[in-house]
Swiss-Prot record:
UniProt source species: Staphylococcus epidermidis (strain ATCC 35984 / DSM 28319 / BCRC 17069 / CCUG 31568 / BM 3577 / RP62A)
Residue span, Toprim domain: 428-542
SMART domains (UniProt xref): HATPase_c (SM00387), TOP2c (SM00433)
Name of the protein in its database record: DNA gyrase subunit B
Domain of life: Bacteria
Amino acid sequence: MVNTLSDVNNTDNYGAGQIQVLEGLEAVRKRPGMYIGSTSERGLHHLVWEIVDNSIDEALAGYASHIEVVIEKDNWIKVTDNGRGIPVDIQEKMGRPAVEVILTVLHAGGKFGGGGYKVSGGLHGVGSSVVNALSQDLEVYVHRNGTIYHQAYKQGVPQFDLKEIGDTDKTGTAIRFKADKEIFTETTVYNYETLQKRIRELAFLNKGIQITLKDEREEEVREDSYHYEGGIKSYVDLLNENKEPLHDEPIYIHQSKDDIEVEIALQYNSGYATNLLTYANNIHTYEGGTHEDGFKRALTRVLNSYGTQSKIIKEDKDRLSGEDTREGLTAVVSIKHGDPQFEGQTKTKLGNSEVRQVVDRLFSEHFERFLYENPSVGRIIVEKGIMASRARVAAKKAREVTRRKSALDVSSLPGKLADCSSKNPEESEIFLVEGDSAGGSTKSGRDSRTQAILPLRGKILNVEKARLDRILNNNEIRQMITAFGTGIGGEFDISKARYHKIVIMTDADVDGAHIRTLLLTFFYRFMRPLIEAGYVYIAQPPLYKLTQGKQKYYVFNDRELDKLKQELNPSPKWSIARYKGLGEMNADQLWETTMNPEHRSMLQVRLEDAIDADQTFEMLMGDVVENRRQFIEDNAVYANLDF
């Protein structure tokens, strides 16, 4: 702990007077989901982020440079920073030490008065007190004023008054807590990779801060430390690592206006997909918002203006749409705001209207100057946009074919689609089934009220290597777009989704895995909001059927099969049938094993790490063979090959 703490420095009048109290903490244990989203694995990890966010705030204020997160034995978490240390003097309104108020009163903290912190990262803004309320045990150690202060809590209740336990020449705060099993009934075990990915993201978004993660649960301690002086510029470098950049360095801007801090990094590559990540106060704004709007608006306007004045765009027909200017773009937009307003289904859309104009103005001034100072790069970017524009015009006719006016519009549906009778998207499912024969079985075995079937013939186009015009000329892709009802590209609208479960159902062999990967690549590159909303699933058809007398067992993998063999009596003799494809199962078997909501097992496709997802699709489906070969060699030991 001591290593992460800072030598005594100026605490800048950060004291109890800056800690404001808004309301009590009684409801937190009764309704934890209101405060941390859920009590699932995701909610468990959210506890860590609430504490880490406070340390990030201290770093953004200029008082901390190192944050350490440790998963201790028995899944205790310890978060230490080398900031000023939480104030320990008496908070006037409550008559208790400020650190105790922060840890026991909801919405008490330096972020609410405006005088303590300029920016607060926490999505819910509830912080330490909620973590305390939802922890079986929590301990705080404050190094401040040359003294170490300590207090312990159980389920949010102080066990003794704040006490002095020693002298120190450091400053900082360490909080240890253990999540309460009464609240987190699903699991209290932390996933190292989940913590690692978010910590790496936070290090990119807060340049210069070092964040270390340690796992002490096993004998061999695992440790990763992240520190990026380049910040989001380094982020873009990593995202484009497996791509072919069109210019050497990412274009970078970091400026403030009207107390809004704007940081943008972008670089074009030779590909066709757009990878635009936006953040507000370190929160990934999956649904976009005003900062994204301002960036897109400025990008389109500046490129058209520059292209026209430089005589690269010579005709009106070559004017660029927003979609054209973003082809092959990798960009990260990050803003910091003293009072962010979040909206949208998942509270991940920035709503502050003033941000749009600030981002637009700061970015357009910088970007325009860059283009005129680097005309060769400007020409490459504009010419790429013109090519995209011509491809878009070529795709227009094909796009019209995919339009479905509404969920009730059946006249435009693909002929092969066996639609469901329900018009309620929340209960409707569509199964994308490999092959016509399997499609026939699934049509016979489904619940026709809520389950639609769309058979796919053969492998769809690899969209990683294709422009939108070519993609829209692919029959299987066109049928999917029409069936889903959302549109594609710039016209994509998730509110028009006809089904809230889109289920990929392929054979359990290598071809099936390839088709599954092609479909996931398409969803990730052109319909990513479907994944982000949790609408995309992978069916789990059985690989084996084991029969013993009149008893049948369906088994989904080799490990389950081995376990079942050991558990069953050798008599009566049993037989094993291996399903090579969905077409080998009759309608009743498909319903019983794979489609019946009462018994089926499905995997929900989730996007937790934009960097890993982007690099994985680029590696598996892109042009660089060497990277793919290396991946196969590294992972061959885990593969279940089917010859």
